[in-house]
């Protein structure tokens, strides 16, 4: 049956469609932090995230990255290939910031000579713990070959994203990705890419991402609108 709610998330709801291999993602006007401990309704956020993520995924598709994105069908809705999500948050860091700086006692804003890929176990009850490759295998999340593919694909995506953001005057500090298995068992990029799941700084070091909400730095939608306008100007 189509249009049945499958899953309710922090930032979007997932619905079935007439095609069993396609789902509809509906972006919400909700901002959260600390795994949902703090929630706020922010009018217009869903529209902006849907537009930004759709634009990024269209460019990734065109660049040969296998993703779940099919098309944006309304201001807040998009169609995606149905995947079985791999319970990993894959974080890539180009610059020290956030939890990385706290964990290792280093200042924010230091360029990393080589981007660092980290894994976090997607489990709200455990507060998404930081894990390594051996934990991933122990938990039967992925094997060696799949882990290597996810890391390589994340680094490839990083190079594309860094270039695009540099072109519009933004520095890509870090980001979180999620992957899933499609109907053929192939690992593809899933979820979203928006300022909700990345850090972006402008030339003056101003936050152009969800840290505006986390750190009470101003209007989240004003910042997201600037990011969208810049991305729309990409060649």
From Swiss-Prot:
<dbReference type="InterPro" id="IPR028923">
    <property type="entry name" value="SAICAR_synt/ADE2_N"/>
</dbReference>
<keyword id="KW-0067">ATP-binding</keyword>
<keyword id="KW-0547">Nucleotide-binding</keyword>
<dbReference type="Pfam" id="PF01259">
    <property type="entry name" value="SAICAR_synt"/>
</dbReference>
<dbReference type="GO" id="GO:0006189">
    <property type="term" value="P:'de novo' IMP biosynthetic process"/>
</dbReference>
<comment type="pathway">
    <text>Purine metabolism; IMP biosynthesis via de novo pathway; 5-amino-1-(5-phospho-D-ribosyl)imidazole-4-carboxamide from 5-amino-1-(5-phospho-D-ribosyl)imidazole-4-carboxylate: step 1/2.</text>
</comment>
<dbReference type="InterPro" id="IPR001636">
    <property type="entry name" value="SAICAR_synth"/>
</dbReference>
<comment type="similarity">
    <text>Belongs to the SAICAR synthetase family.</text>
</comment>
<keyword id="KW-0658">Purine biosynthesis</keyword>
<dbReference type="GO" id="GO:0004639">
    <property type="term" value="F:phosphoribosylaminoimidazolesuccinocarboxamide synthase activity"/>
</dbReference>
<dbReference type="InterPro" id="IPR018236">
    <property type="entry name" value="SAICAR_synthetase_CS"/>
</dbReference>
<dbReference type="GO" id="GO:0005524">
    <property type="term" value="F:ATP binding"/>
</dbReference>
<dbReference type="InterPro" id="IPR033934">
    <property type="entry name" value="SAICAR_synt_PurC"/>
</dbReference>
<dbReference type="GO" id="GO:0009236">
    <property type="term" value="P:cobalamin biosynthetic process"/>
</dbReference>
<keyword id="KW-0436">Ligase</keyword>
<dbReference type="InterPro" id="IPR050089">
    <property type="entry name" value="SAICAR_synthetase"/>
</dbReference>
<protein>
    <recommendedName>
        <fullName>Phosphoribosylaminoimidazole-succinocarboxamide synthase</fullName>
        <ecNumber>6.3.2.6</ecNumber>
    </recommendedName>
</protein>
